[in-house]
Every structure is written in C-alpha cells, then in structure tokens.
Amino acid sequence: MRDFIKFMLLNIGTWVLWFFIVGYLVTKIKDKYLEKDYLFTSLFGFEKDGTWFKKYLKIDKWKDRVPELGGYFGDGFEKRTVADAQSDQIKLFIRETRRAELAHWVMTAGWIFTTAFNPLWAIVFNLVFAHVVNFPCLIIQRYNRARLIKVLNYKN
C-alpha cells in the first residue's frame, strides 16, 4: 500500500508541477508572437466560423462547465465583456486564446515525463489522462477564436 501511495503521489506531483511550469511559462511569451496563428493554432476550414463545434461537438452545452484557470498566473480577461467589446479587446481575447491553446498543447505532452518512472500500463493511463484533460480546453479555445475572428471581421 505504501508503494502505491508513493506511485500515485509521484504521478500526481509530476502533473501538477508540469501544469504549473507550463502555465507560468506561457504567460512569459511576448504578445507579438501570439498575433497570428502558427502550426498548432491554425484553424482548419471547417472550424472557421465555429458552427462545426456547435453542430457536432455540442460545445455550447458543456463549455461553461470546464474550469477556467487562465487568470491564475496573470491578468485574466473578462470574457463576458466581449459582446460589447471594441476591436482591440477582441484582438486581445483572440491572442489569449492562442496563448491558452499553446499551453494546453504543451501540457498534453506532459505524459512523456511519466515514461521515466512508470510501467507501460501507467504510461498509457497518463497518455489518455493528458488528452482527456486537455482536449476539451483546446476545443474551447479554437471555438472561441473562430467566433471572435468572425465578430472582428464583421466589425471591420
């Protein structure tokens, strides 16, 4: 039993530490690097206006239930103000969706660290855990960005 507790604490501690490190580091990325989409943050054609997320993933039914921790390391962005926001605020929110998406992509890779001390079954568990925890957040960021880009284009 003692070994199992050590095993669990090691895995949980690894994830908590990884999430905090990544969360902190992405706040240090200069805004200029988040002004446009790159490889991982580029939206696919079917994502462009956000309707795919609503139709097939029913995102509007569950996205508000996902915990939001983005403001933990820095200034958060009050998302409820976006409906009446000026273009600059919308651009800021779009940039922050890129920051959050990048954070979750990197957090997903955290399972790789668990290969150093886990048996195969636990590595597979951590791989699944990484995706189950981060993919809803990734989807929400992509959905929000697609909708915000649409609003920004309409305003301009």
Language-model region placement:
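Hydrophobic alpha-helical transmembrane segments of multi-pass integral membrane proteins
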Residues: 14-21, 68, 74, 78, ...
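Alpha-helical transmembrane segments of multipass membrane proteins
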Residues: 14, 18-26, 107, 133, ...
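Hydrophobic core segments of alpha-helical transmembrane domains in multi-pass membrane proteins
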Residues: 11, 111-114, 122-133
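Residue-level signature of transmembrane alpha-helical entry/exit and packing/kink sites
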Residues: 3, 7-11, 15, 92, ...
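Cytosolic/matrix-facing juxtamembrane and C-terminal tails of multi-pass cellular membrane proteins
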Residues: 135-156
